């Protein structure tokens, strides 16, 4: 996954839009989501290379959410590296993040045509849930009465739905 990500071309312009994307995706991380997708796929089929672009789509999407989360939290560091809005600026972080979302969809759409509708439906519903979780997280920062059930639901939406999506997509 790391090698595949590193070799993806970013030939479009402006360079200042795509440089932060390459930067974010080169920071590393555990790559749990693409790994889960590949493992889910490998339970049923023996050629995981076939869905490598889709696995990278999930990683691109995940990193898009981190880029925007860093901006919302005004974080200085991510994985020991300067965040995009600190290294460049907030506008670049927003635009590069938005472009990562589009790239994630473009990469996901490269799946087998017979599974495309199902995959995109799952991906879209998951993306909406993650946004809902992020909004709850932001709202909870201004509340002193957050119930445990609300907090757990926020964590489920922000974190577990994408992990579940990875396994489900692999199985599709």
Regions from the language model: what does each represent?
Residues 1-9:
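N-terminal amphipathic/basic leader segments beginning at the initiator methionine
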Residues 10-172:
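Mg2+-dependent prenyl diphosphate-binding active-site environment of isoprenoid biosynthetic enzymes
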């Amino acid at each position: 996954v790391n090698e595949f990500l590193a070799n993806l071309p970013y030939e479009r312009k402006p360079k200042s839009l795509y440089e932060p994307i390459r930067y974010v995706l080169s920071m590393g991380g555990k790559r749990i989501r693409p790994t889960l997708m590949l493992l889910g796929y490998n339970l049923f089929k023996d050629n995981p290379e076939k869905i490598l672009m889709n696995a990278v789509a999930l990683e691109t999407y995940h990193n898009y959410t981190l880029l925007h989360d860093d901006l919302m939290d005004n974080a200085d560091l991510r994985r020991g590296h300067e965040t995009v809005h600190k290294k460049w600026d907030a506008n670049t972080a927003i635009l590069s993040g938005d472009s990562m979302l589009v790239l994630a969809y473009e990469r996901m759409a490269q799946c087998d045509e017979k599974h495309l509708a199902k995959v995109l439906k799952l991906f879209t519903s998951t993306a909406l849930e993650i946004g809902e979780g992020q909004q709850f997280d932001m709202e909870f920062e201004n509340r002193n009465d957050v119930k445990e059930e609300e907090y757990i639901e926020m964590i489920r939406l922000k974190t577990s739905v994408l992990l579940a999506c990875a396994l489900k997509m692999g199985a599709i």
